[in-house]
A protein has these predicted regions:
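ATP-binding glycine-rich phosphate-binding loop
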Residues: 2-24
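Active-site acidic catalytic loop and adjacent metal/ATP-binding pocket
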Residues: 20-23, 62, 178-246
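ATP/Mg2+ or Mg2+-diphosphate-binding catalytic cores
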Residues: 298-340
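ATP-binding pocket architecture of kinase catalytic cores
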Residues: 27-124
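Active-site activation/catalytic loop segments of kinase-like enzymes and analogous catalytic loops
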Residues: 245-278, 291-310
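ATP-dependent phospho-/nucleotidyl transfer catalytic cores
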Residues: 12, 32, 122-214, 268
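A glycine-centered beta->alpha junction motif in the catalytic cores
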Residues: 80-93, 144-153, 251, 293-311
Length: 340
Protein backbone atom coordinates (compact mmCIF):
# COMPACT_ATOMS: atom_id res chain seq x y z
CA UNK A 1 0.00 0.00 0.00
CA UNK A 2 2.91 2.38 0.64
CA UNK A 3 4.48 1.58 -2.73
CA UNK A 4 1.22 2.50 -4.47
CA UNK A 5 1.73 6.08 -3.30
CA UNK A 6 4.67 6.55 -5.69
CA UNK A 7 4.53 7.47 -9.38
CA UNK A 8 6.39 4.45 -10.73
CA UNK A 9 5.84 0.93 -11.99
CA UNK A 10 7.01 -1.75 -9.59
CA UNK A 11 8.81 -4.68 -11.24
CA UNK A 12 10.03 -6.60 -8.18
CA UNK A 13 10.62 -6.21 -4.43
CA UNK A 14 13.06 -7.97 -2.15
CA UNK A 15 13.75 -7.59 1.56
CA UNK A 16 17.02 -5.93 2.48
CA UNK A 17 18.41 -5.00 5.89
CA UNK A 18 15.39 -3.41 7.59
CA UNK A 19 14.16 -2.11 4.23
CA UNK A 20 12.76 -3.15 0.84
CA UNK A 21 14.81 -2.96 -2.34
CA UNK A 22 12.45 -2.11 -5.19
CA UNK A 23 13.16 -2.59 -8.87
CA UNK A 24 11.06 -0.04 -10.75
CA UNK A 25 10.75 1.44 -14.24
CA UNK A 26 12.70 4.41 -12.81
CA UNK A 27 15.61 2.36 -11.48
CA UNK A 28 16.40 0.80 -8.10
CA UNK A 29 14.82 2.39 -5.03
CA UNK A 30 14.97 1.69 -1.30
CA UNK A 31 11.85 1.86 0.88
CA UNK A 32 12.37 2.02 4.64
CA UNK A 33 10.56 2.98 7.81
CA UNK A 34 11.36 6.46 9.14
CA UNK A 35 11.06 7.68 12.73
CA UNK A 36 12.51 11.18 12.40
CA UNK A 37 10.85 14.51 11.67
CA UNK A 38 9.67 15.91 8.33
CA UNK A 39 11.72 19.03 9.03
CA UNK A 40 14.90 16.97 9.19
CA UNK A 41 13.98 15.17 5.95
CA UNK A 42 13.32 18.46 4.16
CA UNK A 43 16.72 19.75 5.28
CA UNK A 44 18.50 16.68 3.88
CA UNK A 45 16.52 16.86 0.64
CA UNK A 46 17.26 20.57 0.17
CA UNK A 47 20.98 19.89 0.49
CA UNK A 48 21.13 16.75 -1.66
CA UNK A 49 19.17 18.32 -4.52
CA UNK A 50 21.83 21.04 -4.80
CA UNK A 51 24.65 18.54 -5.38
CA UNK A 52 25.88 17.91 -8.92
CA UNK A 53 25.72 14.14 -9.35
CA UNK A 54 26.07 13.99 -13.14
CA UNK A 55 29.75 13.03 -12.95
CA UNK A 56 31.67 10.63 -10.72
CA UNK A 57 29.82 11.42 -7.48
CA UNK A 58 26.39 10.00 -6.56
CA UNK A 59 24.18 10.43 -3.47
CA UNK A 60 21.04 8.60 -2.33
CA UNK A 61 18.44 11.32 -2.88
CA UNK A 62 14.90 11.00 -1.56
CA UNK A 63 11.95 10.27 -3.86
CA UNK A 64 8.73 12.22 -3.31
CA UNK A 65 5.36 10.46 -3.50
CA UNK A 66 2.41 11.38 -5.75
CA UNK A 67 1.41 14.10 -3.26
CA UNK A 68 4.87 15.65 -3.46
CA UNK A 69 5.66 14.59 0.12
CA UNK A 70 8.88 12.94 1.36
CA UNK A 71 7.00 10.91 3.96
CA UNK A 72 4.42 8.21 3.14
CA UNK A 73 2.05 6.71 5.72
CA UNK A 74 1.17 3.03 5.98
CA UNK A 75 -2.22 1.78 7.20
CA UNK A 76 -0.82 1.09 10.68
CA UNK A 77 0.32 4.72 11.01
CA UNK A 78 4.02 4.07 10.49
CA UNK A 79 5.99 6.42 8.22
CA UNK A 80 8.11 5.41 5.24
CA UNK A 81 10.64 7.12 2.98
CA UNK A 82 11.91 6.13 -0.45
CA UNK A 83 15.33 6.97 -1.84
CA UNK A 84 17.72 6.07 -4.64
CA UNK A 85 19.40 2.70 -4.14
CA UNK A 86 22.90 1.71 -5.27
CA UNK A 87 23.64 -2.02 -5.48
CA UNK A 88 27.40 -1.41 -5.54
CA UNK A 89 29.83 -2.89 -3.04
CA UNK A 90 31.41 -0.99 -0.15
CA UNK A 91 34.84 0.59 -0.48
CA UNK A 92 37.46 -2.08 0.21
CA UNK A 93 39.67 -0.51 2.88
CA UNK A 94 42.38 -3.10 2.26
CA UNK A 95 42.82 -1.79 -1.31
CA UNK A 96 45.06 1.30 -1.33
CA UNK A 97 43.86 2.54 -4.74
CA UNK A 98 40.20 2.20 -3.80
CA UNK A 99 40.72 3.99 -0.48
CA UNK A 100 42.39 6.94 -2.21
CA UNK A 101 39.64 7.06 -4.84
CA UNK A 102 36.93 7.07 -2.14
CA UNK A 103 38.72 9.87 -0.28
CA UNK A 104 39.04 11.99 -3.43
CA UNK A 105 35.26 11.63 -3.91
CA UNK A 106 34.74 12.75 -0.30
CA UNK A 107 36.78 15.87 -1.11
CA UNK A 108 34.53 16.42 -4.14
CA UNK A 109 31.45 16.13 -1.90
CA UNK A 110 32.93 18.54 0.65
CA UNK A 111 33.76 21.06 -2.06
CA UNK A 112 30.13 21.08 -3.19
CA UNK A 113 28.78 21.21 0.38
CA UNK A 114 30.93 24.29 1.04
CA UNK A 115 29.02 26.18 -1.66
CA UNK A 116 25.70 25.69 0.16
CA UNK A 117 24.74 28.57 2.43
CA UNK A 118 23.11 27.56 5.76
CA UNK A 119 19.46 28.62 6.12
CA UNK A 120 17.73 30.12 9.14
CA UNK A 121 15.28 27.20 9.34
CA UNK A 122 18.14 24.72 9.69
CA UNK A 123 18.62 25.83 13.29
CA UNK A 124 17.73 22.50 14.94
CA UNK A 125 19.54 20.20 17.33
CA UNK A 126 20.45 17.53 14.79
CA UNK A 127 22.19 20.09 12.56
CA UNK A 128 23.89 22.34 15.13
CA UNK A 129 25.69 19.55 17.01
CA UNK A 130 28.23 19.57 19.86
CA UNK A 131 31.50 21.21 18.79
CA UNK A 132 34.71 19.16 18.47
CA UNK A 133 36.33 20.79 21.49
CA UNK A 134 33.21 20.23 23.65
CA UNK A 135 33.09 16.59 22.55
CA UNK A 136 36.76 16.07 23.45
CA UNK A 137 36.17 17.82 26.79
CA UNK A 138 33.36 15.38 27.57
CA UNK A 139 35.51 12.41 26.56
CA UNK A 140 38.34 13.59 28.86
CA UNK A 141 35.86 13.74 31.77
CA UNK A 142 34.61 10.23 30.92
CA UNK A 143 38.17 8.87 30.85
CA UNK A 144 38.88 10.33 34.31
CA UNK A 145 35.61 8.98 35.67
CA UNK A 146 36.42 5.43 34.51
CA UNK A 147 40.00 5.62 35.85
CA UNK A 148 38.82 6.92 39.25
CA UNK A 149 36.32 4.08 39.50
CA UNK A 150 38.98 1.46 38.66
CA UNK A 151 41.53 3.01 41.04
CA UNK A 152 39.11 2.61 43.94
CA UNK A 153 38.50 -1.09 43.22
CA UNK A 154 40.10 -4.03 44.98
CA UNK A 155 40.93 -7.25 43.14
CA UNK A 156 41.25 -5.71 39.69
CA UNK A 157 40.55 -7.72 36.52
CA UNK A 158 43.11 -8.03 33.71
CA UNK A 159 41.28 -5.29 31.78
CA UNK A 160 41.38 -2.94 34.78
CA UNK A 161 45.09 -3.59 35.40
CA UNK A 162 45.73 -2.88 31.73
CA UNK A 163 43.88 0.46 32.06
CA UNK A 164 45.93 1.46 35.13
CA UNK A 165 49.13 0.56 33.29
CA UNK A 166 48.34 2.67 30.20
CA UNK A 167 46.08 5.46 31.48
CA UNK A 168 48.61 8.22 32.22
CA UNK A 169 50.18 7.93 28.78
CA UNK A 170 46.93 8.09 26.81
CA UNK A 171 45.34 10.64 29.15
CA UNK A 172 48.28 12.98 28.51
CA UNK A 173 47.57 12.74 24.76
CA UNK A 174 43.87 13.44 25.34
CA UNK A 175 44.67 16.52 27.46
CA UNK A 176 47.16 17.86 24.91
CA UNK A 177 44.69 17.34 22.03
CA UNK A 178 41.93 19.10 23.99
CA UNK A 179 44.14 22.04 25.02
CA UNK A 180 45.35 22.56 21.45
CA UNK A 181 41.84 22.19 20.01
CA UNK A 182 40.56 24.79 22.50
CA UNK A 183 43.38 27.14 21.44
CA UNK A 184 42.54 26.60 17.79
CA UNK A 185 38.90 27.57 18.27
CA UNK A 186 39.47 30.12 21.00
CA UNK A 187 38.15 33.67 20.61
CA UNK A 188 41.60 35.17 21.26
CA UNK A 189 42.90 35.75 17.75
CA UNK A 190 46.68 35.81 18.48
CA UNK A 191 46.91 32.49 20.35
CA UNK A 192 43.93 30.57 19.09
CA UNK A 193 42.67 31.43 15.64
CA UNK A 194 44.57 31.93 12.43
CA UNK A 195 45.47 35.47 11.49
CA UNK A 196 42.65 37.18 9.60
CA UNK A 197 44.96 37.60 6.62
CA UNK A 198 45.04 33.81 6.16
CA UNK A 199 41.26 33.52 5.87
CA UNK A 200 38.92 34.42 3.05
CA UNK A 201 36.05 36.87 3.64
CA UNK A 202 33.58 33.97 3.53
CA UNK A 203 35.60 32.01 6.12
CA UNK A 204 35.81 35.09 8.36
CA UNK A 205 32.03 35.56 8.22
CA UNK A 206 31.48 31.92 9.13
CA UNK A 207 34.02 32.20 11.95
CA UNK A 208 32.27 35.24 13.44
CA UNK A 209 28.90 33.50 13.24
CA UNK A 210 30.35 30.27 14.72
CA UNK A 211 29.09 28.38 11.68
CA UNK A 212 30.87 25.47 10.13
CA UNK A 213 30.30 23.79 6.80
CA UNK A 214 27.96 20.91 6.03
CA UNK A 215 29.52 17.54 6.88
CA UNK A 216 28.35 13.97 6.19
CA UNK A 217 28.54 13.31 9.93
CA UNK A 218 28.80 9.51 10.00
CA UNK A 219 31.32 8.53 7.38
CA UNK A 220 32.94 5.12 7.14
CA UNK A 221 33.63 2.58 4.39
CA UNK A 222 30.05 1.24 4.60
CA UNK A 223 28.77 4.58 3.28
CA UNK A 224 31.21 4.76 0.34
CA UNK A 225 30.04 2.53 -2.53
CA UNK A 226 32.24 1.86 -5.55
CA UNK A 227 30.21 1.90 -8.77
CA UNK A 228 31.23 1.57 -12.41
CA UNK A 229 32.71 4.99 -13.17
CA UNK A 230 31.26 6.64 -10.05
CA UNK A 231 31.35 6.57 -6.26
CA UNK A 232 28.13 6.80 -4.24
CA UNK A 233 28.36 8.40 -0.79
CA UNK A 234 25.17 7.51 1.06
CA UNK A 235 23.22 7.93 4.33
CA UNK A 236 22.98 11.62 5.25
CA UNK A 237 20.82 11.20 8.36
CA UNK A 238 23.62 12.63 10.53
CA UNK A 239 24.57 15.49 8.24
CA UNK A 240 25.26 18.64 10.25
CA UNK A 241 27.16 21.93 10.34
CA UNK A 242 30.67 21.41 11.63
CA UNK A 243 34.29 20.81 10.65
CA UNK A 244 34.54 18.82 7.42
CA UNK A 245 37.96 17.47 8.46
CA UNK A 246 36.03 15.28 10.92
CA UNK A 247 34.58 13.25 8.02
CA UNK A 248 38.08 12.77 6.62
CA UNK A 249 39.41 11.82 10.06
CA UNK A 250 36.73 9.16 10.63
CA UNK A 251 37.40 7.43 7.32
CA UNK A 252 41.19 7.75 7.59
CA UNK A 253 41.27 6.43 11.17
CA UNK A 254 39.33 3.29 10.21
CA UNK A 255 41.82 2.66 7.41
CA UNK A 256 44.90 3.44 9.53
CA UNK A 257 43.82 1.03 12.26
CA UNK A 258 43.37 -1.75 9.67
CA UNK A 259 46.81 -1.03 8.16
CA UNK A 260 48.80 -0.80 11.41
CA UNK A 261 49.18 2.99 11.13
CA UNK A 262 51.09 2.82 7.85
CA UNK A 263 52.43 6.39 7.55
CA UNK A 264 52.94 6.28 3.78
CA UNK A 265 49.31 5.26 3.28
CA UNK A 266 48.12 7.95 5.69
CA UNK A 267 49.96 10.74 3.88
CA UNK A 268 48.84 9.44 0.47
CA UNK A 269 45.20 9.57 1.65
CA UNK A 270 45.70 13.18 2.71
CA UNK A 271 47.28 13.96 -0.68
CA UNK A 272 44.31 12.35 -2.49
CA UNK A 273 41.93 14.60 -0.57
CA UNK A 274 43.96 17.79 -1.01
CA UNK A 275 44.43 17.33 -4.76
CA UNK A 276 40.67 17.88 -5.03
CA UNK A 277 40.09 20.22 -2.07
CA UNK A 278 43.14 21.79 -0.40
CA UNK A 279 42.74 22.35 3.35
CA UNK A 280 43.83 25.52 5.14
CA UNK A 281 46.25 25.50 8.11
CA UNK A 282 43.47 25.51 10.66
CA UNK A 283 41.80 22.44 9.16
CA UNK A 284 45.11 20.56 9.03
CA UNK A 285 45.80 21.36 12.67
CA UNK A 286 42.28 20.29 13.55
CA UNK A 287 42.82 16.97 11.73
CA UNK A 288 46.07 16.46 13.64
CA UNK A 289 44.44 17.10 17.04
CA UNK A 290 41.63 14.67 16.21
CA UNK A 291 44.24 12.00 15.43
CA UNK A 292 46.22 12.90 18.56
CA UNK A 293 43.18 12.29 20.76
CA UNK A 294 43.21 8.55 21.72
CA UNK A 295 39.62 7.90 20.61
CA UNK A 296 39.86 4.10 20.56
CA UNK A 297 41.23 4.13 24.12
CA UNK A 298 38.42 6.41 25.32
CA UNK A 299 35.89 4.09 23.63
CA UNK A 300 37.16 1.06 25.56
CA UNK A 301 37.04 2.91 28.89
CA UNK A 302 33.59 4.32 28.20
CA UNK A 303 32.26 0.91 27.15
CA UNK A 304 33.65 -0.55 30.38
CA UNK A 305 32.13 2.16 32.58
CA UNK A 306 28.68 1.98 30.98
CA UNK A 307 28.33 -1.83 30.98
CA UNK A 308 28.61 -4.68 33.46
CA UNK A 309 31.99 -3.94 35.05
CA UNK A 310 32.16 -7.36 36.67
CA UNK A 311 32.61 -9.06 33.30
CA UNK A 312 34.52 -7.56 30.41
CA UNK A 313 34.99 -9.72 27.29
CA UNK A 314 38.57 -10.86 26.64
CA UNK A 315 38.44 -9.15 23.23
CA UNK A 316 38.22 -5.75 24.98
CA UNK A 317 41.40 -6.49 26.94
CA UNK A 318 43.02 -7.58 23.67
CA UNK A 319 41.96 -4.29 22.06
CA UNK A 320 43.70 -2.32 24.83
CA UNK A 321 46.85 -4.40 24.41
CA UNK A 322 46.74 -3.88 20.63
CA UNK A 323 46.53 -0.11 21.14
CA UNK A 324 49.70 -0.30 23.22
CA UNK A 325 51.43 -2.49 20.61
CA UNK A 326 50.48 -0.17 17.72
CA UNK A 327 51.45 3.01 19.56
CA UNK A 328 54.97 3.38 18.11
CA UNK A 329 53.60 3.23 14.55
CA UNK A 330 50.79 5.62 15.49
CA UNK A 331 53.28 8.12 16.98
CA UNK A 332 55.41 7.99 13.82
CA UNK A 333 52.33 8.77 11.72
CA UNK A 334 51.38 11.65 14.05
CA UNK A 335 54.89 13.13 13.69
CA UNK A 336 54.58 13.04 9.90
CA UNK A 337 51.06 14.47 9.97
CA UNK A 338 52.16 17.34 12.22
CA UNK A 339 54.84 18.35 9.69
CA UNK A 340 52.43 18.34 6.72
Amino acid sequence: EVLEQYEMELLSVRKGRGAWICETDKGLKLLQEYRGTVRRLEFEDQVLEKLDTRGSLRVDRYVRNREGALLSKAGDGSNYIMKEYFPDRECNIRDHYEIRLGISRLAMLHGQLRQIQPKEEWNMGSICVESLEKEQERHVREMKRARNFIRGKRGKTEFELCVMDTFDYFFQQAKEALDQMNNLFSESKPSGQLAAAELSTEDLERQENSLGYLCHGDLDQHHVLMGNGYTAIIEYNRMHLGVQAEDLYRLMRKVMEKHGWDGDLGISMLDSYERVRPMDKKERKCLYYMFLFPEKYWKQLNFYYNTNKAWIPAKNTDKLKNLKNQENARRRFLERLEKE
